[in-house]
């Protein structure tokens, strides 16, 4: 499951957009 990196990036992006 190499989606951990994507999830981290997505979470970071979400926080930035907030």
From Swiss-Prot:
Transmembrane segments: none annotated. GO terms for cellular component: ribonucleoprotein complex; ribosome. GO terms for molecular function: rRNA binding. Keywords: Ribonucleoprotein, Ribosomal protein, RNA-binding, rRNA-binding. It comes from the Bacteria. Coiled coil: none annotated. Signal peptide: none annotated. One of two assembly initiator proteins, it binds directly to the 5'-end of the 23S rRNA, where it nucleates assembly of the 50S subunit. One of the proteins that surrounds the polypeptide exit tunnel on the outside of the subunit. Belongs to the universal ribosomal protein uL24 family. Part of the 50S ribosomal subunit. This is Large ribosomal subunit protein uL24. It comes from Serratia marcescens.
